[in-house]
Amino acid sequence: VYDQVYPIIIMKKPAKSTARKKFERPVLFFSQMWYNAGSYFSGKDIFILKAIGRVISSAILLVLTGLMVAFAKAAPNVVFSFYPALSKSILSAIASVSSLVPIALWEVLTVLLALWFFYTLIRVFTGRRSLLRWLSGVLLGLSAGVFLFVAIWGLGHFGPSVDKSLGLDVREYSKQELIAATAYYAAQANEYAEKVERNVENLTVYPAFSTLSKQAPDGYTALARQYDQFTDGLGPVKPLASWRLFSQTGTTGIFICFTAEACVNPDTYTAWIPFTMCHELAHRQAVTAEDDANFCAYLA
């Protein structure tokens, strides 16, 4: 009897590369750490840890916001040598998306956010959601909103006024100069009053809101050829769908930096609408101060 020797083939796994091992080690470490945390802490404790994490994240965002403001105040020449251009670039990128819809996108997002707010609040009162977790989520959302507001647009409040960016000579004017300026603008108003279209009752006939909203950016297109402060290619101004609410507070327009939308209340004096459109478009040009936006609207 001859013993038959059967070869045994042992399949070995190919050796892992050093780079792959280095990648997998931290992944396995954090996975194991999370598993161990789940073993040591109950579900309630996990929610508490998440709430603490949100509070810490909120604190970090608020500290970063404070640092941005402090640095802008301490070194305005450095910050505002690049921030206005950066702000306009970010707003242009956002506007390239929000301009795809004819309505004010921020109003839709506000309604959805309000619905989500009350939905989660109801879950708190019904015991399906922890109050601490809900409050930490609200805090994180508000902190993120403040951080983004300052980073995208709001930091301009601490920058130089528009007269400096345009290189204008600002000085105290005499009484005679003010009288001369008043007479000049009165003559200009009378001259153009004869050129505007009027109806049978001799009242001015204004173009439709949609027509004015498309014409308003043209003023800044002309200014962009003369001043670096301004850019062309601005989208049309949008009407406010919730104009009744804004009419209650006397608000004629609003600019939302999160969606880069310049919006105007159509329920206002018709003669004010063109100026208000140019005012809100000035905010779209990273002009934050209200007086500066008024002056830019006058130029446009």
Question: For the regions a protein language model found, what residue spans apply to each?
Answer:
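Short, positively charged and aromatic/hydrophobic N-terminal segments
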Residues: 2-10, 32-36, 40, 44-46
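Positively charged N-terminal leader segments that act as targeting/secretion signals
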Residues: 4, 13-32
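Membrane-interfacial entry segments at the cytosolic side of transmembrane helices
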Residues: 50-55, 128-139
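Membrane-embedded alpha-helical segments of integral membrane proteins
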Residues: 62-123
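Active-site recognition of the HExxH zinc-binding catalytic motif
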Residues: 102, 275-287, 294, 298
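Transmembrane alpha-helices and immediately adjacent membrane-cytoplasm interface residues
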Residues: 118-119, 132-163
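Membrane-interface segments at or immediately adjacent to transmembrane helices
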Residues: 156-223
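Auxiliary, metal-adjacent structural segments of Zn-dependent hydrolase domains
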Residues: 200-266, 270
